[in-house]
Amino acid sequence: MSDGNHENRTAWGFLGVRLPLPEDKQWAADQVTILKALGVLDPETGEPTARLEVVKAADLARLTQEAWQTERDKMIKTCTKCHSESYAREQLGMGDKIMQDADRLMAEAIEVVAGLYRDGIIKKPADYAFAYPDFLFFMQTGGAEGAKNLEVSHIDQVLFEMYMKHRMRAYQAFFHVNPDYAYWYGWAMLTKDLGEIKEMAKTMRAVHGGTKK
């Protein structure tokens, strides 16, 4: 964009995930959980699925360290036209940190919903590859048939919005050096989503247990 075109490429890509995984073990585990919810990794084995090729073809994520570093270096070069390099690196590092923190909340929420699938409380839609949340079905959280019949999973919808809307706002706002927006419309909403998901899951488990009796 600094050269006058409208190309918008970043180190973290559209999906906010990357390979290789971060060095921090907890963050790496959280990113793996998110990759499973994107359908890029098999939730049971952790192995890549065919959807990884779709992500590659659409260039939705940086999948090598070199690709990630190339985009980060471009950004630093742009920032240093007005700011010192140390300031630019510090600000970009803050963006990385809020993503790490957001991923902790995101992974916890995914695991809560995945547990409902695992225990049969949420039924796997026929066209889902796995009994697991699937973000790349977008708003069709009951699968194509469920969307047609309006039989969608509400807790999945909240989880999807947490990922696609509030997580993105949290880290993208930091990369735009807008901490106020990142907090109010990103981080605060992420914590709200997680609380709502936990409460809904508790209710769903209680209802399911009562139904079984």
Predicted regions and their residues:
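Primarily the internal scaffold of c-type cytochrome electron-transfer domains
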Residues: 1-208
